[in-house]
Every structure is written in C-alpha cells, then in structure tokens.
C-alpha cells in the first residue's frame, strides 16, 4: 500500500481537516462512527481507501491523521463533533495555552512541550503503514501555531523521515483581509522554513476563496465552512488517484517530479472547476473543455495572484468522473493555443494529466452542485512571486520600526532570524524572476534551431 499520513496543525489546519475527512467518509461510504455498511464491505477488493484509512479488527476505519493545536478549544470541537467516534482519541492532541499569533511561541516555547507527543503518535501511524508514501500537512502561515509549530513539525519530520515527500497546504494571509497584525512576520518566518523542509506547498488564501464562493455560488457572506468544503474538494481531487482507480493515476511523489523544476520553486497555485450551485448546474452543460478553461481562469485561482502576470512552468490537471483521455488531449491542445496562457519556453510540454473515474461527491445540503465531472489544477507559475512580494512589503514596513519584535525576542528568538528569513524570501523573489527571464535570453539562440525545421 502507498499510505499517506495527514497532519492538521492549528485552527485553520484542523477546520480544513474536518471538511476533508467529512468528504472522504462520504466518498468511501464510511459512517461517522468508522463503520462501513455491509453492502459496501462486499466490494472488499476495492481497498484503495486504505491509503488514508486503517482498518481495525472490529471493522472500524480510522483515518491516518493527527490533529494538533496548542490550545484545546478547536480540538475539543472535534472531540465532541459528529465525527468524534471516527478518530482515535490519541490522534487529537491539544496543549494548554495557545501560541497567541506568535511564531516564536509556536516554534520554541509552547511548541516544544507538545512536539514529542505528536512525533510519537506519527511514529505509531507510520509503523502501521506498509509503504508510507509521505505526509500531507495542513496549516496557516499567518497564525502562531500553524506557522511556528507547523515549521517545527516539518523540521522534525525532515530529520525522522528524510526521504518521504511532504506536501503542504498553506492558508496564506489575504491582501485585504487580515486576521492578525503580525501576520507578515509569521508568514515570512514560516516561509523561510517551508522553503527548506517541504517538497510542494500549495497556497490557499481566504480572500480568493471568498470571492469564488460569492461569485460562483451566490453566497453573500461565506462562512469558513463554505470555504473549507471548497478546499476539501481540491484536496479530494488531488488524492482521489490514491484512493480510487483510474486511467491515469497520479502518485504523491509524481506531483513533485512534474511540478518542481528547481527545489526552491515549489509554491503552487491551485484552482478547481466547476464551482457551481445546484440551481445553475441544472442549466449548464459542463464539458471537459469548459471545465479546463475555467480552471485556467485567473478569477478561479485559490490564491490572490494573477497568472497572466507570469509564466507557467508546469501544471498538473486532475480530472475525475466521466472523462476520457481523448477529451483531455483536445482540451489541453486548446489551452496551448491561447495567448493569455504563457509557458516558459524551456518547458514546452508543461502538462501532467490524471484521470480518475470516481465522480466528485458533494456534502448533502452543501453549496456545491453534484456534477458528472470536475477538474483540479495545480500549477507552478512565476506569478506566485506577487504573493511573496506583497508580504515582504508589509514585513518591511513593520520591521523598519522593529514593531512587535520584542514579543518574539521575549520567547527566545533572535533578531537575526528575522533578517535571515527576509533575505531568504528576497532571494526567492529573485529566483522566480530569473526562472521567468532565463527563457528570454535563450530565445535568441533558439531561433536558429527553429529555422531548420
């Protein structure tokens, strides 16, 4: 088996986790108490869901995941929620006092009290796997726990499981909507760590997803539940090929191979289509080429960043439902002819496609319509540098006055770590710039070849 362990850190990570496991259970016909009704059990040959669930002797299916927060309230909601019987009680780990939006508290003082318990639990989960493929980590980079403790966790995982892939789903601070004053500090400090210790980071940002909910689902005031269910669909599409069979299945390590041209350039944009409400879906024919086009729409990107301002290096299209390779090839060919979608010229093919025959499942009573086919796109574009430069500007404004820095230093950080992290991000912006430019300089040389064709 190719198991995957999910780690949900901090409030954002746990709430996204709730939405994900709710969806996974629906997709596999697992009840909130972990039982699989007998009619489903007869499909015993279809045990691909064991990548995400482990089965106990009593026929109960337990998610291979850990929920961690430095304060108890959010984890307590899981402990008392609908799915309380699904999770092993030791997988729900909470500390006593929170990180107070402070990276240093999450990373140094409060974090180190909880980290060993977590790693011990992860070790047990890993021992329970026959062929552990890697980790999915869910956290926000703006808070204290997701950023500080999340990075501590990644650093320790790198030591213990060096060769395993780590995919990160990061809730990134939005340009306009802020939940904490010190977000820029936490984000810059944690990105410094994400650069080194994770293989692929998929950027999500609340504001972008709010806009998608408002525009496509006509929800006037989206709640976190609306947002998280949409994020869960993306994560479900990415992992569908691990949990079901399909024509072109994609492994977790394949994301890395196909999307990351250079180790540091591993921050991805994601989009999902079709995001439609039931009233609209009834009147629309959502063909493969239509959903592919809308996955490339800048407005459908789940992070506030416009891919038209950059070039694509690679992208991965994960289709599910009623889709055949012929349609996919046609849709991709159409995308390649569009002038607005530019690829760097050192990566001429640029597309990795996966097809999975399991149609998307929706949460009953949720906002999304039940559709026959859907696509999730993960793309590596130089435009993501916009997200970093926005954050760096905010960081610089505060750091120039050393505002709020004493809270971090008081928790055992050194001021040098701030400037080190900031320099690392400046280097990252430069890297993205060079990856985009490299091609222009090469263009002169290429013209000679083209003439020979």
From Swiss-Prot:
List ligand-binding residues for GTP. Answer: 11, 71, 144-145, 179, 206, 228
Where is it located? Cytoplasm, Cytoskeleton
Give residue numbers for the modification (N6-acetyllysine).
Answer: 40
Catalytic activity from the UniProt record: GTP + H2O = GDP + phosphate + H(+)
Cofactor section:
Mg(2+)
Matching entries from InterPro entries are given as: Alpha_tubulin, Tub_FtsZ_C, Tubulin, Tubulin/FtsZ-like_C, Tubulin/FtsZ_2-layer-sand-dom, Tubulin/FtsZ_GTPase_sf, Tubulin_C, Tubulin_CS
Record's keyword terms, sorted: Acetylation, Cytoplasm, Cytoskeleton, GTP-binding, Hydrolase, Magnesium, Metal-binding, Microtubule, Nucleotide-binding
GO process annotations (BP): microtubule-based process
Tagged with keyword Cell membrane? no
Residues under site feature: Involved in polymerization: 453
- Top enzyme class of this protein? hydrolase
Q: Which domain of life is it from?
A: Eukaryota
Q: Which GO terms describe its molecular function?
A: GTP binding; hydrolase activity; metal ion binding; structural constituent of cytoskeleton
How does it get modified after it is made? Undergoes a tyrosination/detyrosination cycle, the cyclic removal and re-addition of a C-terminal tyrosine residue by the enzymes tubulin tyrosine carboxypeptidase (TTCP) and tubulin tyrosine ligase (TTL), respectively.
| EC number in record | 3.6.5.-
Pfam families attached to this UniProt entry:
Tubulin, Tubulin_C
A single Gene Ontology CC term: microtubule
Main location, first listed in the record: cytoplasm
Name the active site residues. 254
Locate the residues binding Mg(2+).
71
Cytoplasm keyword on record: yes
What function is annotated for this protein? Tubulin is the major constituent of microtubules, a cylinder consisting of laterally associated linear protofilaments composed of alpha- and beta-tubulin heterodimers. Microtubules grow by the addition of GTP-tubulin dimers to the microtubule end, where a stabilizing cap forms. Below the cap, tubulin dimers are in GDP-bound state, owing to GTPase activity of alpha-tubulin.
Quaternary structure annotation from Swiss-Prot or TrEMBL: Dimer of alpha and beta chains. A typical microtubule is a hollow water-filled tube with an outer diameter of 25 nm and an inner diameter of 15 nM. Alpha-beta heterodimers associate head-to-tail to form protofilaments running lengthwise along the microtubule wall with the beta-tubulin subunit facing the microtubule plus end conferring a structural polarity. Microtubules usually have 13 protofilaments but different protofilament numbers can be found in some organisms and specialized cells.
PANTHER family hit by this protein = TUBULIN
Q: Which family does it belong to?
A: Belongs to the tubulin family.
UniProt protein name = Tubulin alpha chain
Q: Which organism is it from?
A: Plasmodium falciparum (isolate K1 / Thailand)
